[in-house]
Each structure stands twice: as C-alpha cells, then as structure tokens.
Amino acid sequence: MIELKKEIYEKLVSEAEKISDEEIRNVTLNILKEPKITFTKAEPKISLHESPAAPKKHHAYPGGLVEHTWAVLTIAKNLAEIFERTYHVKVNRDLIIAASILHDIFKFYQYEKDPITGGFRPRSDWYLSHQFSIIAELSFRGAPEILIRCLAEMHGSVPTSMIESEIVKFADSVDAKFVSRIQDIIRDSCKDIELLTDGKYIVQKTYPQILMKKTIFELARIYYEKGRDKLTEFIIRELGIKLEE
C-alpha cells in the first residue's frame, strides 16, 4: 500500500509543477520533494509516505497523509472550477494547488509508530503543531506573503480574507469528515470482534492491523455491499482470529 501512496505522491509533484507563479512553484516543489523542517533542529520519526493524517481522527492508516493531501487538492480544484463557473469569481489556481499540497505536509513530524497497538501515536517530545511549522518554514524560506497568508487563514489562525483559503479549508474539512465516517464503520466491526472474543482482540489492535492488510475503501465496500456482519467476518478471517465454539 505504501507503493500506491508513492504513486499519489508523484501526482502531487506533477500538480505542483503546473503552478505558474515561479516563486510559489519553487517553494512548493522544494518542500514537497524534500519535506524537511529547516527553521529549527528537528528530526521526524516516520516518513511522509508512511504517515497517517492523524493517529485516530481521520486517514489513520499508513499513507493516509499523502492520500488526504491528494483528496484535498482534487476537491479544492473542482470547487474552484464550480465557483468560477457558477458565481463568476476569479480563483487563484496557484494558491489552490500550493496550499492544498502544503497544508498538512509537516504532520508526519508529530507522529511515531505505536509499539503497543501497531498503529501510530502523537510524539511526546514534539512541540510544534503542523499548522505553525508550515508557516514558520515558509517564512524562513522567504516564500511569497500571499501563500503564507493563505495557509494561515485556511488553518483558522487568522480571519479569512481570501476565497482560496475558504476553498482549501472546506476541501480539507469535507475529506476529513468523510473518511472519519468510513473509519467509524470499520471500528464498529472491530468493536464487535472485541465483544465476540471477550476482550481478547481489542479494537485498538485489530483496527490498525486490518488497515495494514487492506485499504480503508476495500473494507468499506464490503460494508456497503454486504453489511456490518459480513465486514466483521471478513476482518476475522483476514486476521486469523479464532472464535471459541
């Protein structure tokens, strides 16, 4: 699955290369190709490609961060087109692409692998949230003020004054809420397994384990086509769980 996320990453690079403004394009590509915090001494414990978008809330699986970034970019571009056609407003596509790509890019610095559950957890030694890290890094690299402002606004740090900030913020929210709902469906089946095994297989372990083997939407498809019980049975088989007679 990590290989699939690397394919998505290459698509992000391709989109960044389409940015017409040279300064915005260069800083976006430089950070995307080498996502490293340089304004302070800091080292990540996991890579961008393997990172979840969040340990629990949404896209909480390996590669979830890259997948979420691609979804936000795709949604934001389509929203921009809809708003331009419907309301005849001018949307800066360079900002849409750059802000979508960069909005969560340093999240992987915040997380580490969880040796107990097999999933991910927040680092206890990390002191910078991603929304502040990207603003500081862009400022340190001398990025255009309009890009810094767009990202600050879409993260809610300051009042919104740009339509591009609103579009990316909305795209981010839509994708996060949608995938969070799908995750709840899968967690419910994992909770069923915990009850069926009298707590032997707890949800905190079965949930990350099944997402190491199957994509979230492979599992969701089973639920929508066959129902919750069939999804629970599928997870039991995939994880080799033995139910007592």
What are these regions (language model features)?
Residues 21, 159-162, 227:
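Intrinsic-disorder/low-complexity, polar/charged segments
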Residues 1-120:
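Acidic/His-rich, divalent-metal-binding segments that scaffold phosphate/diphosphate chemistry
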Residues 53-58, 67-68, 84-197:
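Divalent metal-dependent catalytic cores for phosphoryl transfer on phosphate-bearing substrates
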Residues 200-245:
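Terminal helices and disordered tails flanking the catalytic cores of nucleotide-processing hydrolases
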